[in-house]
């Protein structure tokens, strides 16, 4: 058996293959994830939305005050250098000679495969004359030619070449290692050990340790775990939090503490500026000692948030701190919503009376505070202040108008263009157009609700203890799209009404006099209709003297006439009875036909119901698969916010609650992917008692005030189906056992009879 040899790369050819593949594995994914986004595309996007969002703070901070950032340039330089190295190594690999080539004697002799023996000998003579050492030729080349000639003419050499790929027989197997030989050289052993020790014993543990230390401090939503603990404690302590208490707890987050967050700063000037703002606000209680809510960092965050809600001007040294605090508020409020929901679930699972769940008002106040923080408005301010150029001074002209009395954004949008223009007459044309552009960009979301019980035979029948699934389909449109459609429909309806106004007046006048003239005609018609209802003619009564004379003169004739009248009456009665029988037969035939039609309709209806249930089942399966596989982007639509320092996307909270009992029925679902349409499933257990229940589905925005949607949800809960005591499957099993017992008894009796016969014999 041939020996095996392991050798390192002395020439460096195989090392280039390894190095090229290693650099490619780093450069290609890094380019995909780290290449800076095209700044021109971002500038074009900002230019397109300038008309609507031009007055927003986040827009002005991004566009009007661009800060030179060297990080994208550094990324591009590093990535381009990596690609240059990768291309150089690939070029180097393409130019390296192949050390291990398959031995082919035809190539050595410059012959085509399949040449005849005569051609081989002829070519060998020509090449041997050319490369023979005695005639000044190349000795190595001559040996290769002789070896190739022997491989093609000698039987043993040809057999070795066909089996082992070499005329000399099997050779030693060599394994190359794609590392340069100087790495394992004894002279460089200390240097190699130092590099390995530095990489795997110093750099790697430091990187992993620092990453682990930072990651264990944060939750999955990048919120400090200490902040979650603070929120859990104070939410449990104060189960019914008003807005003032909620702001106080929100400001106690560790994200604002410089000890836990390096981005949070504390300046010496805060000791002078913060007390001044406290005196201007005038509604901050400093007597309570409730750490960390009364710590300096928490007090500073609370003052900055209250000044933002009041739209107060603050010193420039505090503007940066206020912007940092406001950027953290949406995520912190979402964490507080999660904490409240977790405590509600814990209270339901525990039967202890001491564990008190937070109220529904606390949850809704968190959602309202998110809207307030984004828009920079206090709780009871008008939603119209979210629009540009509408401030406290001119708001009274809009809300206290004698004719319109606009209170909400929907009221303002629903007006006609002329009425809206007269209402906002105090605005210039450019400002009015800007207000209309912003107003038309506001979202208008509609909800379609359907409740059912999935994975059940009768999905529409809700029973006690079943898991109710409420499928909510959200459709998002802009205010401009919705009310333009409504106004176009109204205009289309009003135009033909105006065109035909004269004709309608004429018809009305005609109707007046036509009703008077038609009075007697109607009575005549009614009399005519009453005549066929009479079956017997009324007899004409004659005077008594005339009757006696007629009887005496025509006695027999009178009797015959009387007999004829009796026969006519009998014939009339017979015809009437025949007509009644025919009517009954036709009525029975109609009833039979109607029964058949009703049966067909029921069958068709049942088939349609089955098809609808099957389609719903398939759609639910597809929704689950999409939810598991698809990862939708959370970039929906930018929010119009005049005083928020960061571009925020439209997100929503969707949940079900009982307004009468003030309880939460289903946990809030944070809808972060609503661009046009979105389907959301809300699940909750059915009530424990049968009856009719009135719930409410809430859709609350986390960014806009006054755009929440509320829709009632009625549930009719029935008694749970009884557990079947007898089942056909069980009956078949019992019958099988009885048959087996009968067969066993029959076999026993047959054996007894055979034994008796043997005894008789």
From Swiss-Prot:
A Gene Ontology term for the protein's cellular component: Sec62/Sec63 complex
S-S pairs: none
Lumenal side: 1-14, 91-188
Composition bias type Basic and acidic residues, residue spans: 583-609
Subcellular location: Endoplasmic reticulum membrane
Residues covered by region (Disordered): 492-618, 720-761
Biased composition annotated in UniProt, kind: Acidic residues: 734-761
Domain J: 104-165
InterPro entries (UniProt xref): C2_domain_sf, DnaJ_domain, Ig_E-set, J_dom_sf, Sec63-dom
Membrane topology: Multi-pass membrane protein
Phosphothreonine found at: 538
GO terms of molecular function: protein transmembrane transporter activity; RNA binding
Residues recorded with modification Phosphoserine: 743, 749
Primary localization: endoplasmic reticulum
UniProt biased composition (Basic residues): 518-537
Subunit structure, as described in the record: The ER translocon complex consists of channel-forming core components SEC61A1, SEC61B and SEC61G and different auxiliary components such as SEC62 and SEC63.
PANTHER family referenced in this protein's UniProt entry, alphabetically: SEC63 DOMAIN-CONTAINING, TRANSLOCATION PROTEIN SEC63 HOMOLOG
Name under which the protein is recorded: Translocation protein SEC63 homolog
Species whose genome carries this gene: Pongo abelii
